[in-house]
Amino acid sequence: MPDYLDDLRLAHVLADAADAATMDRFKALDLKVETKPDMTPVSEADKAAEELIRGHLSRARPRDSVHGEEFGVAGTGPRRWVIDPIDGTKNYVRGVPVWATLIALMEAKEGGYQPVVGLVSAPALGRRWWAVEDHGAFTGRSLTSAHRLHVSQVSTLSDASFAYSSLSGWEEQGRLDGFLDLTREVWRTRAYGDFWPYMMVAEGSVDLCAEPELSLWDMAANAIIVTEAGGTFTGLDGRPGPHSGNAAASNGRLHDELLGYLNQRY
């Protein structure tokens, strides 16, 4: 079995560098922001953080390929680093501290690339989460100061906390009725958004979360952290992993019900 612990240590080094770069420009009055063709914002900090990570990887892992949100895919091979330099750019540019750098290492396996290392670093919140395949999921500020994550044991929707990002995507995909039905069945709903609800599923403070449209870089790190914490991460089609263009994550006990509601009348 491959040992990915050296890759995890590298992911922490990458995150440390990205944290310094992104925090340096967070709330800067002269922050430059552009609009991408898909009408989403990108800041100078997004680009700088991804370039920084790519530079480190080119020196530390020259044979690995890289797939980043801002600069696409570079290289080929069985190992691929997937990077979202700032997940939550809209929050970042408005001074909201809920944003993070997402770093995943994916390896070619049967059925395609699968995440084997994942790290989420949210420096404005002072939080970091990570996981390695078959080694569990953890949170802390460093490898030497961490505690293990476990999903909740909640087994009924009436006791469950459900998190999401926004309503518009569910309506655009014709899934709003099922989504609203689900919100009526659960104990609590909150629109935490972006990476955060997945980390809370892994921590056991949220039981369910879902988003109707995502890219690989939005999901790769989140997926392995949730699953290594004992949870379930699939697309809305039930396919395991971050490959469906959308996501559903849970403590596992409620996953079938989550998918059932979000797929009804669709």
Curated annotation (Swiss-Prot):
Molecular function, one GO term: metal ion binding
Required co-factors: Mg(2+)
Entry binding sites for Mg(2+) 2: D84, D87, D218
Enzyme Commission code(s) on record: 3.1.3.15
Residues bound to substrate: E69, I86, D87, G88, T89, R190, D218
Keywords assigned: Amino-acid biosynthesis, Histidine biosynthesis, Hydrolase, Magnesium, Metal-binding
Disruption phenotype: Cells lacking this gene exhibit an auxotrophy for histidine, but can grow on minimal medium supplemented with histidinol.
Catalytic activity: L-histidinol phosphate + H2O = L-histidinol + phosphate
SUPFAM superfamilies (alphabetical): Carbohydrate phosphatase
Translocase recorded as keyword: no
GO aspect biological process, one term: L-histidine biosynthetic process
Pathway: Amino-acid biosynthesis; L-histidine biosynthesis; L-histidine from 5-phospho-alpha-D-ribose 1-diphosphate: step 8/9
Family annotation (InterPro entries): His_9_proposed, Inositol_monoP_metal-BS, Inositol_monophosphatase-like
Positions contributing to Mg(2+) 1 binding: E69, D84, I86
Domain of life: Bacteria
Family, similarity comment: Belongs to the inositol monophosphatase superfamily.
Function: Catalyzes the dephosphorylation of histidinol-phosphate to histidinol, the direct precursor of histidine.
Name assigned to this protein: Histidinol-phosphatase
